[in-house]
From Swiss-Prot:
This is Phosphate import ATP-binding protein PstB. It catalyses: phosphate(out) + ATP + H2O = ADP + 2 phosphate(in) + H(+). The complex is composed of two ATP-binding proteins (PstB), two transmembrane proteins (PstC and PstA) and a solute-binding protein (PstS). Belongs to the ABC transporter superfamily. Phosphate importer (TC 3.A.1.7) family. Residues 7-248 form the ABC transporter domain. The keyword RNA-binding does not apply. ATP binds at residues 39-46. Its EC number is 7.3.2.1.
Length: 253
């Protein structure tokens, strides 16, 4: 039986020392779709996506209860290879974070880390990734130049290219447009629409309009809980919970 869900979260609770951050989270993420996570600051959205590639593991006091399944396998099983997990579940952060290397080496870096050393393969994969990130035409003549010289929007697309170079199954995006201007934001949103054909994308956003533009599914977080989740259109047009309605109409948050 083929599962239609890329990620399934069951009864997830997350603690940092005595602080109970996420409470009884249940959520299914379908394959090759965009799911938006919305909610006020401090409600647990970023903590949640960091449970999906075990980035919280490095934070002192972290512990969890419950299950997070990727393609049917619990990522918190003791035999899980965390390096391999993070290859499958890539991450794009709020602020673009290119390495102080050339544009080419920024994209090639992950390939080298994962053991690829064939020059022709790396060159081909770098070009494919930059094209997929809608950046190739802007940088193809300056691949040896520092990535730090790119604009903010270009740097964020470079970070997306770096993420997809190692062919993940899932891309996590933690407010990827919050530091960008409107034109750069539009380019990232257009890119998300294109990437969903090949990847499962989960995006944290405070921008309600962005959530409606880019996602098929939405989950509303509040005080560490999911108030409701479902089709984005339903969440925004006919929310089932008054707290959801109050948030998306700007009554709080």
């Amino acid at each position: 039986m083929i599962c239609m869900y890329r990620i399934e979260v069951e009864d997830l609770n997350v603690y940092f020392d005595e602080a109970h951050i996420l409470k009884d989270i249940n959520l299914k993420i379908p394959k090759n779709t965009v799911t938006a996570l919305i909610g006020p600051s401090g409600c647990g959205k970023s903590t949640f996506i960091r449970t999906l590639n075990r980035m919280n593991d490095v934070i002192s006091g972290f512990r969890h209860e419950g299950h997070v399944y990727l393609d049917g396998k619990d990522i918190y099983d003791p035999d899980m290879d965390v390096v391999e997990l993070r290859k499958k579940v890539g991450m794009v952060f709020q602020k673009p974070n290119p390495f102080p290397k050339s544009i080419f080496e920024n994209v090639a870096y992950g390939l080298r880390v994962h053991g690829y050393d064939d020059r022709d393969f790396i060159e081909e994969r770098v070009e494919e990734s930059l094209r997929a990130a809608a950046l190739w035409d802007e940088v193809k003549d300056k691949l040896d130049k520092s990535a730090l010289g790119l604009s903010g929007g270009q740097q964020q697309r470079l970070c997306i290219a770096r993420t997809i170079a190692i062919e993940p199954e899932v891309i996590l995006m933690d407010e990827p447009c919050s530091a960008l201007d409107p034109i750069s934001t539009t380019k990232i949103e257009d890119l998300i629409h294109k990437l969903k054909n090949d990847y499962t994308i989960i995006i944290v956003t405070h921008n309600m309009q962005q959530a409606t533009r880019v996602s098929k599914y939405t989950a509303f977080f509040l005080h560490g809980e999911i108030v409701e989740s479902g089709l984005t259109e339903q969440i925004f047009i006919e929310p089932r919970d008054k707290r959801t309605e109050d948030y998306i109409t700007g009554r709080f948050g």
